[in-house]
Amino acid sequence: MATLLRGVLRPLYAFRGGPGPPAGVPFRAVSHGTGLLYPEHIPTSVLQKVLLAAGSAGMALYDPYRHDMVAVLGETTGRRTLKVLRDQMKRDPEGAQILQERPRISLSTLDMGKLRSLPEGSFGRAYLHFLDVNRVSPDTRAPTRFVDDEELAYVIQRYREIHDMLHALLGMPTNILGEIVVKWFEAVQTGLPMCVLSALFGPIRLSAQSLQLLISELIPWAVENGRRAPCVLNVYYERRWEQPLQALRQELGITEPPLRVEGLV
């Protein structure tokens, strides 16, 4: 029994939640007889995935800021949804190009000097402003490990790496309320189980005032925008830096948030 348990739990020991290879590394198949489908891939059985999903769900619900656990939950529960998202990308010219070229978003791939030189009001400057004000880095996104399909692994990696861009588009900060609003938008957009769980259970820690604002104004706004917008995975954001933020919002059908949520928890 002990030997069986060690075998089942081996991926848990292998997973440390730490940084993977630089995001500039191409997301391509690397098997060559190793059984690995892409960098950082950890092959897992169905039982191992069930255990990983259960454990990560519990930790993510207890502490929504455990991004490593949220990442594992997304990888172990979203295969069917990832296939739907992948097919949506393949049917869209811009999405298909992203799937083919596999761009990555990190400090090593972004030209920060160029972003700083862009005019105020551009999408690139808005994204840079979001990073600076909230003191976040694109390098903090966990690498995909437990998706046993190289193409689907890239889809969820891409979803993670554009998360901060969605914050900038939606005008949401990184406080608890802002993250929950973005998760509602992402849940409607992607249908990923971990987005749905985060959207439903994230508000547990909110104050009564923030919860009231969330339910009465912010959730309806996020749901409406999520339904109206085309698939956000089909936008080649790296080629939209110079586009005015308002023009990109209009293209995607994203309206201004009904209120500012900075300082609300």
Curated annotation (Swiss-Prot):
Residues 1-29 form a transit peptide. The modification Phosphoserine is found at residue 108. The lineage of its organism: Eukaryota, Metazoa, Chordata, Craniata, Vertebrata. It is a peripheral membrane protein. GO terms for molecular function: 4-hydroxy-3-methoxy-5-polyprenylbenzoate decarboxylase activity. InterPro entries: Coq4 (IPR007715), Coq4_euk (IPR027540). Its main location: mitochondrion. Belongs to the COQ4 family. Lyase that catalyzes the C1-decarboxylation of 4-hydroxy-3-methoxy-5-(all-trans-decaprenyl)benzoic acid into 2-methoxy-6-(all-trans-decaprenyl)phenol during ubiquinone biosynthesis. Zn(2+) binds at residues 163-164, 167, 179. This is Ubiquinone biosynthesis protein COQ4 homolog, mitochondrial. The gene is COQ4. It catalyses: 4-hydroxy-3-methoxy-5-(all-trans-decaprenyl)benzoate + H(+) = 2-methoxy-6-(all-trans-decaprenyl)phenol + CO2. Keywords: Lyase, Membrane, Metal-binding, Mitochondrion, Mitochondrion inner membrane, Phosphoprotein, Transit peptide, Ubiquinone biosynthesis, Zinc. It is found in: Mitochondrion inner membrane. Its EC number is 4.1.1.130. Pfam families: Coq4. Pathway: Cofactor biosynthesis; ubiquinone biosynthesis. Disulfide bonds: none annotated. GO terms for biological process: ubiquinone biosynthetic process. GO terms for cellular component: extrinsic component of mitochondrial inner membrane; mitochondrial inner membrane; mitochondrion.
